[in-house]
Amino acid sequence: MSTPDPALGGTPRPGPSPGPGPSPGAMLGPSPGPSPGSAHSIMGPSPGPPSAGHPIPTQGPGGYPQDNMHQMHKPMESMHEKGMSDDPRYTQMKGMGMRSGGHAGMGPPPSPMDQHSQGYPSPLGGSEHASSPVPASGPSSGPQMSSGPGGAPLDGADPQALGQQNRGPTPFNQNQLHQLRAQIMAYKMLARGQPLPDHLQMAVQGKRPMPGMQPQMPALPPPSVSATGPGPSPGPAPPNYSRPHGMGGPNMPPPGPSGVPPGMPGQPPGGPPKPWPEGPMANAAAPTSTPQKLIPPQPTGRPSPAPPAVPPAASPVMPPQTQSPGQPAQPAPMVPLHQKQSRITPIQKPRGLDPVEILQEREYRLQARIAHRIQELENLPGSLAGDLRTKATIELKALRLLNFQRQLRQEVVVCMRRDTALETALNAKAYKRSKRQSLREARITEKLEKQQKIEQERKRRQKHQEYLNSILQHAKDFKEYHRSVTGKIQKLTKAVATYHANTEREQKKENERIEKERMRRLMAEDEEGYRKLIDQKKDKRLAYLLQQTDEYVANLTELVRQHKAAQVAKEKKKKKKKKKAENAEGQTPAIGPDGEPLDETSQMSDLPVKVIHVESGKILTGTDAPKAGQLEAWLEMNPGYEVAPRSDSEESGSEEEEEEEEEEQPQPAQPPTLPVEEKKKIPDPDSDDVSEVDARHIIENAKQDVDDEYGVSQALARGLQSYYAVAHAVTERVDKQSALMVNGVLKQYQIKGLEWLVSLYNNNLNGILADEMGLGKTIQTIALITYLMEHKRINGPFLIIVPLSTLSNWAYEFDKWAPSVVKVSYKGSPAARRAFVPQLRSGKFNVLLTTYEYIIKDKHILAKIRWKYMIVDEGHRMKNHHCKLTQVLNTHYVAPRRLLLTGTPLQNKLPELWALLNFLLPTIFKSCSTFEQWFNAPFAMTGEKVDLNEEETILIIRRLHKVLRPFLLRRLKKEVEAQLPEKVEYVIKCDMSALQRVLYRHMQAKGVLLTDGSEKDKKGKGGTKTLMNTIMQLRKICNHPYMFQHIEESFSEHLGFTGGIVQGLDLYRASGKFELLDRILPKLRATNHKVLLFCQMTSLMTIMEDYFAYRGFKYLRLDGTTKAEDRGMLLKTFNEPGSEYFIFLLSTRAGGLGLNLQSADTVIIFDSDWNPHQDLQAQDRAHRIGQQNEVRVLRLCTVNSVEEKILAAAKYKLNVDQKVIQAGMFDQKSSSHERRAFLQAILEHEEQDEEEDEVPDDETVNQMIARHEEEFDLFMRMDLDRRREEARNPKRKPRLMEEDELPSWIIKDDAEVERLTCEEEEEKMFGRGSRHRKEVDYSDSLTEKQWLKAIEEGTLEEIEEEVRQKKSSRKRKRDSDAGPSTPTTSTRSRDKDDESKKQKKRGRPPAEKLSPNPPNLTKKMKKIVDAVIKYKDSSSGRQLSEVFIQLPSRKELPEYYELIRKPVDFKKIKERIRNHKYRSLNDLEKDVMLLCQNAQTFNLEGSLIYEDSIVLQSVFTSVRQKIEKEDDSEGEESEEEEEGEEEGSESESRSVKVKIKLGRKEKAQDRLKGGRRRPSRGSRAKPVVSDDDSEEEQEEDRSGSGSEED
């Protein structure tokens, strides 16, 4: 029995209660195990908490089951229909029904879903059924406490608990409640048709209390409120009823508080179902409000099988007789009532059979049978036949579905009951009784209806208006809301964008800062810091470069080690051989200081030999010692003396060194260890007691340990010896110059250079001394030779190879600095050179000075001498690895030690640098391609983009420097010579005279030079002359127009001069540059500034001499024609302190090398060289050691001219040199194409940019040339005086020629020039009939290699003569072949053959060329073709002819040429027009139509090109018709104008064609040499200009075409 729990509001709890056992609940589904109704499960259920899977039967008010409530509805409905609504019983029943739905104070009524989920309980839920004759058969049944409708106890219950149970005050007192309950019970019994017991009747009337009678009331509903604990019933159970075995006996679990068995927890009234707690005693703490979705139980009459047995572990068995502590067994309160009743009816009526019990028993048995059958079916053997097994499976599944079907039916019934009940039906009005309507009511109803309608209409309108207002308001709100939202979003977006922008800016700043820091560390050569930053950035490319650098340097280090080891082994072998020979002879001849036997003719016979007195030990050295030649005679005269053994000084040292090296060689892989001297404890540099010797040790160690990029700690950490330290392992300190050097003291940086050169010698290495020009490379070389002679006892022979122009300078320097050194200047005529042979054979000399030419020519003499040292001045001459000089030196001359002197080691290309290194150290620098690829395209192998950014470029440059550092020493003037005055360079723009402007314009546009017509016997009428090499002609015009002889002759005649030479003012008025010089030179002479004036062209120097003579300037001239012996004299004359010569006129190529002209402080470069290094060399003739004044370099440049392009190209090349490398710019395999494009760009018209090309005025020029304020003021005064003087002159002329001064034949408009050009073309076609002058051919008749070879072998003139003969013979042969055929007999096929041939030579075209068309016809053709080419699509603006201009080559599109037999394009058509192949417009039309048909054949129909070709056909037809119509209407004059234009354009196209195709013509001239074709080269060799070269043309060509190679 359950009692109410006051704390938890009556949460039901399991407890022993009388009853027949658990009510079978609905199962969730079929179970494969035994059914709950089986014998097994019925026999042994154990009490415990219910399973969560079993539903709780919902209960009605006061604990009545829900089905009773539904039964109560039936009488209520019948009473309502009979009109008994006023009956008090009806109201009571209605109140009870309402309570079942819930009143105020009991929470809201349950929703239909809740009702549905609660379902309807089984009638077998409790043992106290109305018709049950026995109270209970449980383990402990006894008198119970009855409970009322609210779940409160009827008697003896705690009022407080009751108050808590109902959760609110009640209007009834206890007696009224008892009476009400009794009335309800009585109504139920009456509704079932059962008699009312007497005590119930009395309780209904309120006469007697109810509780004592409760056990005897069979229909009393089970209590619905649980007690505080599962206490036992107070009395023993009457043993008058017991179930048979297997139907629930003592082992059955006692029913729950509401007659619900354990496993089906009851539900408190008016609330949702409550779950059972998990443990047996934990229900006190269980929450009362936790909902649990429950499955509704089976309807009445369908008993469910008993719940399955709960395992003992999950629900411990509760003994039936246990009682809670503190709850004593209460005596039954019913005893007095029993006694009183027994007095009235002493014999109790026997109870009848309860049909419900019988039904229940029947159900149990059915369930048992079903469970048994399921078990049988489950245990069937697996060997059954297939059909039997199928039937058994069907039966088993059907039996398992029983509970599911029952549940489904129950849910259907529940839904039907709910939907048909009075209170829950949809239409409540259907149950009302209709009322009869009277007439008055109808009227009233009508009136009310009208009022209602009016009211409804008003309300509708009002509602509609409110609706509209609400819509409008909503629109406003909507807009406002979205405006605010948009504003917020915009603010947010702006904030986010600002945030990201700030973040990005910060990130960018940080990246820039890191990059700057990286660059700073890179430039500061902080390798460790730079590598750290690279690791932080994770830049793979930079890391890859560094890794490559390390690998390459490691390889080179190993190669250097091997080279040095090989040299040491060679030396040792030689010495052993020598010792063996001496031992074999048995006697030791007089040994010279170099360890070799001496004789009278020995080259060291005049050097002192150290001798020692045997007894006293006195040593005689220097002047006291005997000469090597008279040693034996001296020893005879001075007995007791003998030659001092070398072991005391050099020999022992060298032997020890050899032994040490021998020991060190086998262990090259060991980690580097410091030498013995360095292992000595070096004092702390910061301490005070550091002696001078210690300080020197510290500095030496620091100097040796520090490489260019690696600190020694890093090098040691990596286990690598520093690359530089390996190369210069043997160090020797040089503090002062040799005693043999007199007449001057070396500067400190020159001493350092000497030390580096000595280090190269000691380490068996060769190198490049690349100090900037003017730092004294010659002096340092002389210092090395004297040092080796004095300290190393190496007296030569030394071979010094120099340019002819500097040979006299070298001889002068030797005489000045080392007069004791015996030198031979090997030069002159063959007879003079032969005179030196005896001296050379005797070896009585130390140094031989000679030139490149004689090295090659006289190799049979010079190569026989075993040279100790080979020194090449201007070493960049060796930059071509295949040049004759390099090959001769490598193959014929024996010189283990080599030294190159150069001021420009890295000119333009990387292979050139490799060639120098390969010449010096062939064992280390073997492969050019590896070297070039490593520096040129480091990323070519990785697949990444090859272009390099600035940082990568600097890394590459630095790794190149790193490779070069042991072998190359380069110091700049600004670094080593602080006392050297600065050098300032200005580019001064010069204007053109009117004559220059006219000539320049026509030469640039048409490639023609205007003449006065005298060459055609049309003197005065004017004419044109087509010249080759347009750029060269443009440069000449910029320099001076009188460089063209016929122009000067014509002008001299025009101006009234005789002899064809212009003199006086008009010399400088004709040229802008000369006019500028005329303003500058007087000022420089007035302020005692000596001037070096460098020109490219010797003919210009001649004109300048005329000008100097006119102005009275004293000058000296040196060019390629100046003899070598005269050069020294010229230098001496100019450098004399009181020399009257203030201008030295030099050619850039001949006078730019190796001359000391430091007495001059102004350098004027009249015209720039293509190679900027030539100009730099020229500048450094003045800016060199010994210069006292600030040097001004004035570079003259004509505005808006080709000179500006040359200057730009030179600057670009210089930039390449400064950086050493820019990726991709070295690999100039396509240089011919680039050169062609560059020439074409120069020849095209460009817009004049006046602002940029401003010609400086007098004041600006004065600022450029003045060294200080006083000079500037003087120059300004001189300008003022000059202007005043000119103003006073009555015959005053402007400083530059103007157009009105020019003769009429030179002032021609473009049309006239075109006409004259066309006439000249015609004359060329038909022949002039008179002899023609020999034309100067400015193209190279020889290739670079051939020319260089000719220069080296001295056979230039013979080879050129041979080429000329071959040319003429070939021409004669061609003329004889062409003789029989005439233009008139040539056929169409011949035309095609001619058209396919390319013009193979310059000059006059072949005689068989077709006769020209009439100019008018040519004009028409050009006009038609131009119109077709220029036609554009009106919609897209696209030029249709773009793809038809030039066909792709056969290599690019071979399939086109396979398909199309006669390919033609507009370029070919234009060429045929120029060559007069078309004799009529019909011929032209055929080719244009063929072009379009070819396009239509090759391309798909409907493609863009196909459609374009159709359009072009129609365009051609329409243009032709239009032009023919115009032609008919035009007059004779217009025809003549067209003729002039046509001929002009023809000549223009011819000249451009000739200009652009220089490379092709060079190939053609190669063929003239008997068809010998040399393999093509990626980069052509730069020609060597011989200083003996006297031809002006060669000089000009070198400056023009030769310089294109740079």
Swiss-Prot record:
GO molecular function: ATP binding; chromatin binding; DNA binding; helicase activity; histone binding; hydrolase activity; nucleosome array spacer activity; RNA binding
The keyword Zinc is assigned to this record: no
Domain Bromo, chain residue ranges per copy: 1412-1523
Domain Helicase ATP-binding: 758-923
Biased composition (Low complexity): 24-45, 130-147
Gene3D superfamilies xref list: 1.20.5.170, 3.40.5.120, Bromodomain-like (1.20.920.10), P-loop containing nucleotide triphosphate hydrolases (3.40.50.300), Tandem AAA-ATPase domain (3.40.50.10810)
Record's catalysed reaction(s): ATP + H2O = ADP + phosphate + H(+)
Function: ATPase involved in transcriptional activation and repression of select genes by chromatin remodeling (alteration of DNA-nucleosome topology). Component of SWI/SNF chromatin remodeling complexes that carry out key enzymatic activities, changing chromatin structure by altering DNA-histone contacts within a nucleosome in an ATP-dependent manner. Component of the CREST-BRG1 complex, a multiprotein complex that regulates promoter activation by orchestrating the calcium-dependent release of a repressor complex and the recruitment of an activator complex.
Subunit (UniProt): Component of the multiprotein chromatin-remodeling complexes SWI/SNF: SWI/SNF-A (BAF), SWI/SNF-B (PBAF) and related complexes. The canonical complex contains a catalytic subunit (either SMARCA4/BRG1/BAF190A or SMARCA2/BRM/BAF190B) and at least SMARCE1, ACTL6A/BAF53, SMARCC1/BAF155, SMARCC2/BAF170, and SMARCB1/SNF5/BAF47. Other subunits specific to each of the complexes may also be present permitting several possible developmental- and tissue-specific combinations.
Name of the protein described by the UniProt record: SWI/SNF-related matrix-associated actin-dependent regulator of chromatin subfamily A member 4
Upper taxonomic lineage: Eukaryota, Metazoa, Chordata, Craniata, Vertebrata
